[in-house]
């Protein structure tokens, strides 16, 4: 079974405490404890990390900084979701994070077949599709990725009810 983590950054790997103060490049420092929790999820599930955060939209800044921080923990970003925010609009309804994740899963179905995969979404925003709710771990900007969130993600990825 292939296991996938859709990773948001702000509100997952950093929080209101690490966001305080000036940030030279506009990107907050990641919280070491939260990065360690992500590492625990990866280690206990052998999951692949896919970046769904808006950090993916800033090559040379956000994503490069993130890759360095995660590499220090032997975590690699496998891929990233496509930004649909400017591409798809149905009337007044904009594409949401859940749409971007659904498109990634569809686009990568040969590599990660639907019947042979488990996925989890780590995000402090709740704009997921109804079908994704069982796979959604709702973090918060106040606290980021907690031990309880990590445990829930591991249960989802390891298909433990």
Model-based region annotation:
Residues 42-63:
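Substrate-recognition element of Asp-dependent hydrolases with the DxDx(T/V) motif
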Residues 13-14, 57-59, 127-129:
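Short, active-site-adjacent cap segments at secondary-structure transitions
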Residues 63-161:
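C-terminal cap/substrate-recognition subdomain and adjoining C-terminal extension
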Residues 28-29, 57-61, 90:
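Acidic-and-aromatic substrate-binding clefts and catalytic sites of carbohydrate-active enzymes
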Residues 4, 48, 118-120:
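Structural motif
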Residues 7, 52-58, 122-124:
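Short His-Asn-centered micro-motif
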């Amino acid at each position: 079974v292939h296991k996938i983590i859709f990773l948001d950054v702000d509100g997952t790997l950093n929080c209101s405490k690490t966001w305080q103060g000036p940030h030279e490049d506009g990107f907050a420092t990641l919280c070491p404890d939260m990065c360690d929790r992500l590492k625990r999820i990866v280690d206990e599930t052998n999951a692949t990390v896919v970046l769904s955060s808006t950090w993916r939209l800033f090559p040379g800044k956000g994503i490069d900084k993130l890759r360095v921080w995660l590499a220090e923990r032997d975590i690699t970003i496998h891929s990233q979701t496509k930004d649909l925010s400017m591409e798809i609009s149905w009337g007044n309804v904009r594409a949401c994070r859940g749409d971007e994740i659904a498109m990634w899963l569809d686009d990568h179905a040969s590599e990660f077949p639907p019947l042979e995969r488990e996925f989890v979404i780590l995000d402090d925003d709740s704009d997921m599709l109804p079908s994704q709710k069982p796979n959604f771990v709702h973090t918060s900007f106040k606290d980021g990725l907690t031990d309880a969130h990590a445990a829930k993600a591991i249960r989802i990825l390891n298909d433990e009810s």
